Structure formats: structure tokens, C-alpha cells
Amino acid sequence: MSSVLDFAPQGSAPPPVRDAATVLALRDTPGGPEVFMVRRDSRMGFLGGAHVFPGGAVDAKDCDGALHEGVSGFEAVGDLARIHADPARAKGLLMAAVRELFEESGILLARDAGGAWVDLDQEGPLSARLNAGRAELSARGGDFAALMAADGLRVDVAGLRFFAHWITPEREKKRFDTRFFLARAPERQSARHCEVESSAGEWITPGRAFGRYRAREIELVPPTIACLERLATFASVEDALAGTALAAVPCILPKILIGDEVVILYPGDPDYESGEPRPPAGRPTNRLLMRDGLWHRP
């Protein structure tokens, strides 16, 4: 079984679920879109050692209406109810996405007083202050809103596109209700992983990620696999953003079954409701199987 999964004993009460946001930061290459991924430190209690997209739990401050007054682009995101029924919570998820992306990758979706994306590659007082603030945020001691206000920066969520919605299965010890977003990475911002929670970071195409996974060089978990599979269908960042702007985003709550083999059933699988997987026998399925330590489609 994958070493990054952490299941509770059979029959245990499901743990509480926390809202979370994750961002697939994208850039164009001749070989198609690349996404920035980080390798979570193996000592982390959740998905330790796995290659994931930058993200994390929503904080109370993310949902503060006063904070939202200083943010641009909520109207450009579209119907906030697609993200969450509570508008304040939907905005909080978008704010968490921006904050966590900055903490874990150094990519900042914010504009200066002139309306340009912040230039973090230019050495100077601004980049120095932001990098220091990022380090404080990563250590859970900083204030993201105050960091932005100090230099007159304005968070801009207009480029975020709601991409996927996953809830951690009930069998896992830690559970999150996670919204995944796409965003084009601004130029003049070199992504770098956070050394507090991750041990490496890289730009990678979906094809290369799957190749490294099959070679057992990296660990991937099912939501990441599904997002990479979908991202691989787009030829460019613009295609990905346009193709997801208004697309329906179903909520996916997988069911994990542990027996002679580990099976994950997704909504739409013929055995999802019963929770008792049978051999496909020619039927179309929507599931993953764990074989020899790797996830496979049947």
C-alpha cells in the first residue's frame, strides 16, 4: 500500500472535515503546460513524502469580510456559489488559495499600485520584505493581509479557475474538503518550495509526473492523479483556463475498500453505492486499484 496514506481502524468514527484550497500554478512550455509541484516533507503528518500541489486549510482570517474589501477579481471568478453556498466562505477559499500558493511556492497573485503583477525576481527592498514575510507565514507567525497592505499590494483572484472538488475519504485519519483551482503563474516570479513543509519543488508536465511515478521516483495520491490526468488533456495554459471557466465541478467523495486489494471507488462507478466492488467484466468503471504499491486504472 502507498506509504503516504494513513487509514483509521475499521469502524472508527470519521474525523472532522476542514475546508482547504489547492492551486495548480501553470506555465506554458513547448511540451505543453507545466504545473508546479512540491514534495511534502516525509515528517509531515498528512501526505508526507507525496508530490502535491501547493495548498492548505482555510484560516478564519481568510473569511474576514473586511479583508475581502481589499481584494480584486471576485466578480471575474464567476458564480461564487459554484465554490461554496456561503459567499463569505467562497471568498475565504479563494483567499486561502492565494495565501497558501504564496507560502508554499513563492508565487504571489497580487498587483502593485500600478496594476502590474508583483515582480519578485527583481532584487530590492520589496522582494526582500515579501520573502521575509513569506518565511513568517510558513512558520505560522505572519499576517498575510498585513503583509500585502504594508506595500500597497492588492490580491487579485480574477485568474483563478475552479477546477476540482474532493473530500478526503472517511477512512483516512485527517480529512479535508478541498477546492482545487487553476492559475497562470505571473512572469518574474520564480517558484521555490517552502522549506518548512516541503523538501523539494519543481515544474513538471503531467506526462513526466506519471513517468516518474511509474518509475517509483515520486509518490502521487488519487486526487493528484485525477487532476494531472485532466490537465494532460489541454495543449496550453490558455486552453486549460478557458476549458474550465464554466465547466461543472462535481464534488468527489471516494470510497476506500481494503481487502485482498485496495480499491478506491468514485461516483459514477457501478459499485459506488453498494461499496462492494465486483470485477469489471466489461462494465465501464470509475475506480483505482492499488497494485505493487502503485495506483492503476482497471
Where are these regions (language model features)?
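N-terminal leader/linker segments that precede catalytic domains of diphosphate-processing enzymes
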Residues: 1-298
